[in-house]
Amino acid sequence: MSSQQQKQPCTPPPQPQQQQVKQPCQPPPQEPCVPKTKEPCHPKVPEPCQPKVPEPCQPKVPEPCHPKVPEPCQPKVPEPCPSPVIPAPAQQKTKQK
């Protein structure tokens, strides 16, 4: 009977000792690693992305599009319109009558 009692208290103490040693060793290396990777990643990604996209896109698209469309359209519409042809036949018809 006495031999069983001695074995029981001896087996539990070594178990908690091993767990305590492993726990404090795992968290310390993870803590300093997490903030280091997040800090340099966030500011580097948005900085070069924002100024490169809007700068060359906005000024290049509207500049060549606006002046090229209205210029050739305005002079072509009034030119072919037969403004002197309308009064010419009108005068001839009145003279014939």
Swiss-Prot record:
Pfam families: Cornifin. Keywords: Acetylation, Cytoplasm, Keratinization, Repeat. GO terms for cellular component: cytoplasm. Residues 1-42 are annotated as: Disordered. Residues 31-85 are annotated as: 7 X 8 AA approximate tandem repeats. The keyword Repeat applies. Sequence repeats lie at residues 3-14, 18-29, 31-38, 39-46, 47-54, 55-62, 63-70, 71-78, 79-85. Not detected in normal lung tissue but seen in tumor tissues. Cells around the keratin pearls contain high levels. One of its GO terms (biological process) is keratinization. Residues 3-29 are annotated as: 2 X 12 AA approximate repeats. Induction: During squamous differentiation of epidermal keratinocytes. The modification N-acetylserine is found at residue 2. It is found in: Cytoplasm. Belongs to the cornifin (SPRR) family. Cross-linked envelope protein of keratinocytes. It is a keratinocyte protein that first appears in the cell cytosol, but ultimately becomes cross-linked to membrane proteins by transglutaminase. All that results in the formation of an insoluble envelope beneath the plasma membrane. This is Cornifin.
